[in-house]
Amino acid sequence: LRAIARFAEYVVPFMGVAYVSVALIITIINIQLLPSVLLDIVTSAFGMQEAGAGALAAAIKNGIQRGLYSNEAGSGSVPHAAAAATPEPNHPASQGYVQMLGVFIDTMILCTCTAFIILLGTQTGIGEMEGIRLTQTAMEAHLGGIGSDFVSAAICLFAFTSVVANYAYGESNLHMFKLDNKIGRRFYTTGYLAMILWGSMASLPVVWAMADMALGLMTLVNVIAIVILTPTIVAVTNDYKEKRKANKKITFSEKDCHIQGELEEKDIWLGKS
């Protein structure tokens, strides 16, 4: 998992900075259209016509579903990578704040860049398109043929890091089911590769439906766990805030706050500062 994290540490920021830079260039070139685009976003989101037609509810539903694929907030997958990180200050709450920042950057910056790229496009027929083709067409209208190639390359890199990372997430949980052995890993790897093959061959609506169901179940289980662990979350957060307010060295100790259950590794937060 650490090797994957190191790989993503270089690839993901490069992709993100490149994508945001291109979006900024497109926005600056079309700066005169930006006010009308922002107005269109607001009126479309809160317009009475859309609300009356049920389009608002449909947009919220679709936004939540697709938003989870983007930032994975609340789904319980990213904490696997967060658990392998070395936070500074040396406290679980500080890593939690980092994860919150990641959701903000992904949603409010990267997704907003995509929205601007699409809405600033002036090509005809874009309203009938959806998904990656919509973004490719909009980028091509701004930058020519290289725009479509840029989006394809970015998607390939994002998809590759996602596939590799999610494999590691699943593999790290095998020990919870007492399957962290050669046979268990072999079955898991075979099943994972089989799902990738099926996903590449199945129709897009079926893939979306299957993914929506799986991600929904993940999120449901994780949210239930978060609710159950609320006392621990509050205690750990208060411990972090109190130490920061008192200008103490912020390190985590199980003795400083009450947590539910027991840590699987007692020294997990030692020697990481």
Where are these regions (language model features)?
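Hydrophobic alpha-helical transmembrane segments of multi-pass membrane proteins
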Residues: 8-11, 21, 25, 53, ...
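Membrane-interface alpha-helices at helix entry/exit sites of multi-pass transporters
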Residues: 87-105, 180-189
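Extracellular/periplasmic helix-exit of transmembrane alpha-helices
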Residues: 22-40, 48-50, 54, 83-89, ...
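Membrane-interface loop-to-helix entry segments
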Residues: 1-34, 38-42, 208-238, 242
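Transmembrane helix-loop boundary segments of multi-pass membrane transporters
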Residues: 2-12, 97, 118-188, 204-221
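Terminal cytosolic tails of multi-pass membrane transporters
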Residues: 223-273
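Select transmembrane alpha-helical segments in multipass membrane proteins
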Residues: 18, 49-68, 109-112, 117, ...
